[in-house]
Design a protein with these regions (language model features):
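N-terminal strand-loop element at the rim of the active site
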Residues: 1, 20-66
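Nucleotide-activated donor-dependent transferases that construct or modify glycoconjugates
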Residues: 1-7, 11, 116
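Short amphipathic alpha-helix
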Residues: 9-22
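Carbohydrate-associated surface elements
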Residues: 33, 155, 176-177
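A short, charged, and often flexible helix/loop element on the N-terminal side
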Residues: 47-74, 82-92, 122-130
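Short N-terminal targeting/anchoring amphipathic segment
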Residues: 72-96, 106-112, 148
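Membrane-proximal helix-turn-helix segments that form the acceptor-binding/catalytic region
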Residues: 131-150
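Acidic anion/phosphate-binding donor-loop and adjacent secondary structure
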Residues: 161, 172-184
Length: 184
């Protein structure tokens, strides 16, 4: 999440969702305390604490907290109705959380997963063998059963169906929201 910048479109989509819907819903976001692949944390945020960022509360997790143990601690300490996972191929966040859920370490009512184009033929072609193995293991472990899938378009919904089959029973198509103009 902000102040990150490397994830491009998916980050803008999340920021726009929070800023458009933040008066109606409370957003608690858990993210890394640094740009992915960088060793130094952000210098303008409180690490391993909640920070107010726009219309969201953001927890910038240190490497120790951005782990299975840390996620378990954060999830069990917060009240939430829905968990929104902003990636499919993220073993350190989405995968870790879904394993906790699968083996009963965290309880949650609803989970929405947004693959953000990760199932398009072009995206699947990059590191194809690794992704194919990840998908097969995830299916075998039933990590993605019972989720609500969010697609940005009908094309993306079809890509999800093509890869996940009957596992993706509920797919909601919700186009990306536009930026909110800053208040004057």
């Amino acid at each position: 999440y902000l102040p990150g910048y490397r994830s491009g479109g998916p980050l803008r989509t999340l920021v726009n969702m929070v800023e458009n819907l933040g008066d109606e819903f409370e957003f608690l976001i858990v993210t890394r305390d640094r740009v992915f692949g960088v060793s130094e944390p952000y210098n303008n945020v409180k690490i391993d604490q909640w920070n107010e960022v726009g219309k969201a509360q953001v927890f910038y997790a240190s490497p120790l907290m951005f782990s299975v143990t840390g996620f378990k601690k954060i999830l069990n300490a917060t009240s939430h109705d829905v968990i929104y996972l902003n990636s499919f191929f993220s073993p350190h966040s989405t995968g870790a959380f879904l394993l906790l859920r699968r083996f009963g370490f965290v309880k949650t009512k609803s989970i929405v997963i947004a693959p953000r184009g990760e199932f398009s033929p072009g995206a699947l072609g990059l590191k194809a063998a690794k992704k194919k193995i990840y998908i097969q293991v995830a299916k075998l472990l039933r990590m993605y059963h019972g989720l609500i899938w969010q697609a940005s378009s009908e094309y993306e919904a079809q890509d999800i169906r093509n890869i996940m089959g009957s596992i993706a029973r509920v797919i909601l198509v919700a186009p990306n929201l536009l930026s909110v103009a800053p208040a004057v």
